[in-house]
Amino acid sequence: MADLAKIVDDLSSLTVLEAAELSKLLEEKWGVSAAAPVAVAAAAGGAAAAVVEEEKTEFDVILVEAGANKINVIKEVRAITGLGLKEAKDLVEAAPKAVKEGVNKAEAADIKKKLEDAGAKADVK
């Protein structure tokens, strides 16, 4: 059993490149291919990605359009992002553009409401 623990320790210390090289050497030595298990793992990964999408916890707030009250929207973007005046103006003029990324659902809804109250059209994705 001590030999297995040593092997695990040795394998854990390999870099990614060394692990890939080891995989190729074992394929050659044993006459097998790792292609089939990789395809199965990729299919399983796709199913896992679908589950993750349903349980989305991070959202992006997108400024779709500045609207008629562009100055108020620029002020609100500055308050939300902490950007300077020029950067906030550039962001507003480049709409559609992400104002805030990777925020929780409540914060995203709050930011969207603030932008809409300032006269902009915003979206949460």
From Swiss-Prot:
Gene Ontology process terms (BP): translation
UniProt entry tagged with the keyword Cell membrane: no
UniProt-listed InterPro entries: Ribosomal_bL12, Ribosomal_bL12_C, Ribosomal_bL12_C/ClpS-like, Ribosomal_bL12_oligo, Ribosomal_bL12_oligo_N_sf
Organism whose genome encodes this protein: Rhizobium johnstonii (strain DSM 114642 / LMG 32736 / 3841)
Superkingdom as given in the UniProt entry: Bacteria
Keyword Ribosomal protein included in the entry's annotation: yes
CDD domains xrefs: Ribosomal_L7_L12
Homology family: Belongs to the bacterial ribosomal protein bL12 family.
Quaternary structure, from the entry: Homodimer. Part of the ribosomal stalk of the 50S ribosomal subunit. Forms a multimeric L10(L12)X complex, where L10 forms an elongated spine to which 2 to 4 L12 dimers bind in a sequential fashion. Binds GTP-bound translation factors.
Protein name as catalogued: Large ribosomal subunit protein bL12
One GO CC annotation: cytosolic large ribosomal subunit
Organism ancestry: Bacteria, Pseudomonadati, Pseudomonadota, Alphaproteobacteria, Hyphomicrobiales
Keywords, comma-separated and alphabetical: Ribonucleoprotein, Ribosomal protein
GO-annotated molecular function: mRNA binding; structural constituent of ribosome
Function, in words: Forms part of the ribosomal stalk which helps the ribosome interact with GTP-bound translation factors. Is thus essential for accurate translation.
